[in-house]
Structures are given as C-alpha cells and as structure tokens.
C-alpha cells in the first residue's frame, strides 16, 4: 500500500521532515517513490515552514495512496492557505 508520510531528517533537537510518497512496507527514512514537499516545525522569522505540491498529493490520493494523520493535517492547512 502506498502512503504519504513524513520522513525525519535534520540534526539532533532540530527536526526537519520531508513529505514523501512511499510503500508502507519500507522503513520511514528508507526508500521512497517521490518527494512532494517538506515541513519545518522549528521555522522562525522568514523561514518557510511548509511547502507542499498539492497537485502531486491529489494525484497520489487519486491513485489510492493513504495519508498519515499528521500529513492529512498539513494538507488541510496548505489547502486553507492556498
């Protein structure tokens, strides 16, 4: 099953997440199909906190991909902002 989920990157105590489309059987930070955005929960000032390609997310959801709980909230926020 294909899932759109967060893959953690960054340093210790400085999380940075890539939003990726991946097979649910692969590890969280392992192999993925496509990057569709990023999420920076510690963004300050002019730093961009969320970038999401909504066209690609909608494409993958149309193909049957499921969203993780956190990604579903981020997509909802991105649609509200757009």
UniProtKB/Swiss-Prot annotation:
Keywords carried by this UniProt record:
Ribonucleoprotein, Ribosomal protein
- Tell me which domain of life the UniProt entry assigns to the organism this sequence originates from: Bacteria
Question: So what family is this one in?
Answer: Belongs to the bacterial ribosomal protein bS16 family.
Q: What is this protein called?
A: Small ribosomal subunit protein bS16
GO aspect biological process, one term: translation
Q: Is the Glycoprotein keyword given for this protein?
A: no
Q: Which GO terms describe its molecular function?
A: structural constituent of ribosome
Q: Which PROSITE patterns match?
A: RIBOSOMAL_S16 (PS00732)
**Which organism is this protein's natural source?**
Vibrio atlanticus (strain LGP32) (Vibrio splendidus (strain Mel32))
Q: Does the keyword DNA repair apply?
A: no
NCBIfam families annotated for this entry?
Answer: S16
Q: Which GO terms describe its cellular component?
A: cytoplasm; small ribosomal subunit
